[in-house]
């Protein structure tokens, strides 16, 4: 493959495969609050938090690390207690304060808007000074305040995303032939980190390959959604998507060959496809990205592990997956996400053994067309978020 494509793919991977503590949108809020640089939170008179509906959904009922709490309020409080240098690991090593939560609760106003990822924090202190921050479009794109961005974390611009979207599956396969050492280390870290999330049995109903895959994947998701103080390697800014894109393949390797070279290449291919699917749609949407995007990554990764570089098998598996799960809604980050990932595991694994034809519904002719069709449906579901947020907002929590 030519150098320009290799350089682009490497940059994308370094930007889109990152470590996160807790649900990514919880980290987003905490990071945004910490950027306001409030030295004395008890001096606050008013906090205005504005979120896009997708971010609101994902924080509403999810656990916040090192707080023992769930939802928006502890995410804000944790942001006051964390160090902004930790970014999406903002809750690392914090000591939670119930007194600060009680104080903050009376000062917090929340507004939800439509649109892509958006998190604005405006804080007025008792001297009348306004402190503010704004993160938009992706979880690390800080617009306010202006900060010097580290070279390694330079965000991907729209032109680079378009170039990546124009790549073919064959380009990703060619990248596997000569993986840069830094990317091998990144994949190894991802495998190690996400394997460590497997604690206990969330959904254990057997010992066959699929049952093990479901149990390992759902157990990791459950740990993350309950707010355990354990990091996950996120893919395309989503920890659950990272879990869905990696753990089915890691489990399959454990149950079959234990081949580290095949595992690294298959997990890497899954991550590349997951990012590709995300760039074709969006980071957050009304459709469950963990299943539709992380699931498509898992499908192609599993097919690579089982069948090697067989383009016909990739297309067949993508068609079968597209005939199954796309359209499942995203109603926010929560323990129930683990069950959606269980469905994703079943759909991904069964796609290895059945070939659904192009004539079925939204099924495309090949991998690329399947991704495009799923993305089109995802974008068309945009208005659903308003109804989902309305239903969630009426709950007594």
From Swiss-Prot:
Keyword annotations: 4Fe-4S, Iron, Iron-sulfur, Lyase, Metal-binding
Entry keyword Iron: yes
Disulfide pairings: none
GO molecular function: 4 iron, 4 sulfur cluster binding; L-cysteine desulfhydrase activity; metal ion binding
Cofactor annotation: [4Fe-4S] cluster
GO biological process: L-cysteine catabolic process to pyruvate
Cofactor binding notes: Binds 1 [4Fe-4S] cluster per subunit.
Reactions catalysed, as given in the entry: L-cysteine + H2O = hydrogen sulfide + pyruvate + NH4(+) + H(+)
Pfam family, one: SDH_alpha
Record bears the keyword Iron-sulfur: yes
Protein name per Swiss-Prot or TrEMBL: L-cysteine desulfidase
Organism, as annotated: Methanococcus maripaludis (strain C5 / ATCC BAA-1333)
């Amino acid at each position: 493959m030519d150098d320009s494509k290799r350089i682009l793919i490497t940059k994308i991977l370094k930007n889109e495969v990152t470590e996160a503590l807790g649900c990514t949108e919880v980290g987003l809020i905490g990071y945004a609050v910490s950027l306001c640089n409030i030295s004395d939170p008890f001096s606050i008179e008013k906090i205005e938090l504005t979120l896009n509906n997708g971010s609101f959904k994902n924080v509403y009922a999810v656990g916040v690390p090192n707080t023992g709490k769930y939802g928006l309020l502890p995410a804000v409080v944790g942001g006051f207690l964390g160090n902004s240098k930790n970014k999406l690991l903002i809750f690392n090593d914090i000591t939670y304060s119930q007194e600060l939560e009680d104080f903050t609760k009376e000062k917090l106003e929340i507004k939800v808007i439509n649109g892509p990822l958006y998190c604005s924090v405006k804080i007025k202190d008792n001297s009348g000074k306004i402190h503010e921050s704004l993160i938009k479009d992706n979880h690390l794109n800080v617009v306010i305040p202006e900060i010097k961005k580290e070279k390694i974390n330079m965000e991907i611009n729209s032109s680079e995303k378009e170039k990546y979207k124009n790549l073919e599956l064959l380009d990703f396969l060619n990248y596997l032939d000569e993986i840069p050492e830094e990317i091998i280390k990144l994949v190894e870290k991802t495998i190690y980190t996400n394997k460590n999330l497997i604690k206990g049995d969330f959904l254990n109903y057997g010992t066959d390959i699929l049952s093990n895959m479901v149990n390992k994947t759902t157990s990791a998701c459950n740990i993350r959604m309950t707010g355990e103080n354990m990091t996950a390697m996120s893919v395309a800014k989503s920890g659950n998507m990272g879990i869905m894109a990696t753990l089915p393949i890691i489990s399959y390797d454990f149950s079959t060959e234990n081949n580290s070279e095949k595992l690294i290449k298959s997990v890497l291919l899954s991550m590349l496809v997951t990012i590709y699917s995300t760039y074709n749609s969006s980071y957050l949407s009304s459709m469950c990205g963990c299943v539709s995007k992380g699931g498509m990554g898992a499908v192609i990764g599993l097919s690579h592990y089982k069948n090697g570089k067989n383009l016909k098998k990739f297309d067949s598996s993508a068609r079968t997956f597209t005939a199954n799960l796309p359209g499942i809604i995203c109603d926010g980050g929560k323990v129930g996400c683990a069950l959606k990932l269980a469905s994703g595991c079943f759909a991904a694994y069964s796609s290895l053994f059945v070939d659904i034809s192009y004539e079925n519904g939204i099924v495309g002719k090949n991998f690329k067309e399947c991704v495009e069709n799923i993305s089109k449906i995802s974008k068309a579901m945009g208005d659903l978020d308003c109804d989902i947020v309305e239903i969630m907002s009426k709950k007594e929590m």
